[in-house]
From Swiss-Prot:
Pfam families: Inhibitor_I9, Peptidase_S8
One GO CC annotation: extracellular space
UniProt keywords, alphabetically: Allergen, Glycoprotein, Hydrolase, Protease, Secreted, Serine protease, Signal, Zymogen
Domain Peptidase S8 span(s) in chain numbering: 125-397
Keyword Signal among UniProt keywords: yes
Residues listed as glycosylation sites in the UniProt record: 113, 249, 284
GO biological process, one term: proteolysis
Active-site residue numbers: 157 (charge relay system), 188 (charge relay system), 343 (charge relay system)
Domain of life: Eukaryota
Main location (coarse class): secreted
Enzyme type, top EC level: hydrolase
Protein name: Subtilisin-like serine protease Pen ch 13.0101
Propeptide residues per the UniProt entry: 20-115
Length: 397
């Protein structure tokens, strides 16, 4: 259940064809047939973007390429200047659209899957105690009473059981890009949200939580759905005001996607801190997205003895480690569950980001650097080229 991964490996590399605008997968197992993500050039205006979509619709209709159910341009997104849209085309139509000088690139859509001081004694999960201590073996979580107050947490995942007592009425439903069922039928999203901001199990116990459902009950979704969820969260944050107190967690991923990485970069540029799971394949995290997005804070999983978890991804794109093995947190239906994975590690960091925003006023853009600055060099035998930094909330600094 940890880091939710693409069902089959794909897009291990991206080849560029047709004037560098149409990206193709070297391994097509996870590619959704006739589904694309179209990304526009940075200098395309909103008006030009609208005109392009009308033109693309006409091209699709004129060429009579609807015989296989392709419907042409679909939902569009504008994430802090990143403009694009999802589309259902056949490959020839996609090539025609890619020839428009306004188009930066087109890539196939793919499947992704579901990644005053207060002392809380006898914590229900060892991870909480570990992040407020510079040594292993502690059993209390020590934190400032601000506890993420005034910060909004966006859980981009399978949804959140907003009625769970661990959220104390602080969790709200945001959007659902998957289905018409505004519940967490999987449990992964509730668990990660609880780790970040639950009253009992979480780091930032006073933060507001918003459910952004991009994965279904089976834990699967699409890159385009993830981008749509990010787009919604950016717009929601802007509607709440530009105070910079927003964090997002994406404990999910798939193979490398330029579109997902570009969306992640623009989430951060918009003023939202972004924590992402490194992945659970025991391989270099640079092969997956959004873990490989440079602007995101990419998190590997540690064990209770400060080891690098056997399953965790690694490499230079990892910013730091956080507790990710045998983590207990809330689960739909009022109970709890113990899970392992980088999916469990990432929300610890999202929670600390919210905590530091409330306590120190750190900005979203500087939060990852501040977290790394506070982290201890505690991980033993980290894989070559991977940081040994372990999450620490800085309570005794």
């Amino acid at each position: 259940m940890g880091f939710l991964k693409v069902l089959a490996t794909s897009l291990a590399t991206l080849a560029v064809v047709d004037a560098g605008t149409l990206l193709t997968a070297s391994n097509t197992d996870a590619v959704i047939p006739s589904s694309y993500i179209v990304v526009m050039n940075d200098d395309v205006s909103t008006a030009e973007f609208s005109t392009h979509r009308e033109w693309a619709t006409n091209v699709h209709a004129r060429l009579s390429r609807r015989k296989n159910g392709e419907t042409g341009p679909g939902k569009h997104f504008e994430i802090n200047g990143l403009k694009g849209y999802t589309a259902s085309f056949d490959e020839n139509t996609a090539k025609d659209i890619a020839n428009d000088p306004a188009v930066k690139y087109i890539e196939p859509d793919m499947i992704v899957n579901a990644t005053a001081n207060v002392v809380q004694s006898n914590v229900p999960s060892w991870g909480l105690a570990r992040i407020s201590s510079k040594r292993t073996g502690t059993t209390s979580y020590t934190y400032d009473s601000t506890a993420g107050e005034g910060v909004v947490f966006y859980g981009v995942d399978t949804g959140i059981d907003i009625s769970h007592s661990d959220f104390g009425g602080r969790a709200k439903w945001g959007t659902n890009v998957v289905d018409n069922d505004n519940t967490d039928g999987n449990g992964h999203g509730t668990h990660t949200a609880s780790t970040a901001a639950g009253s009992k199990y979480g780091v930032a116990k006073k933060a507001t939580l918003v459910a952004v459902k991009v994965l279904g009950a089976d834990g699967s979704g699409t890159n385009s759905g993830v981008i749509s969820g990010m787009d919604w969260a950016v717009k929601d944050a802007k509607s709440r005001g530009a105070n910079g107190k927003y964090v997002m967690n994406t404990s999910l991923g798939g193979e490398f996607s330029k579109a997902v990485n570009d969306a992640a970069a623009n989430v951060v540029k918009s003023g939202i801190f972004l924590s992402v799971a490194a992945g659970n394949e025991a391989e270099n995290a640079s092969n997956s997205s959004p873990a490989s997005a440079a602007e995101a804070c990419t998190i590997a999983a540690s064990t209770s003895t400060d080891g690098s978890a056997s399953f965790t991804n690694f490499g230079s794109v990892v910013d730091l480690y956080a507790p990710g093995q045998s983590i207990t947190a809330a689960y739909p239906g009022g109970g709890s569950k113990t899970l392992s994975g980088t999916s469990m590690a990432a929300p610890h960091v999202a929670g600390v980001a919210a905590y530091l925003m409330a306590l120190e006023g750190v900005s979203a853009g500087n939060a990852c650097a501040r977290i790394v600055q506070l982290a201890t060099s505690s991980i033993s035998r980290a894989p070559s080229g991977t940081t040994s930094k372990l999450l620490y909330n800085g309570i005794n600094v």
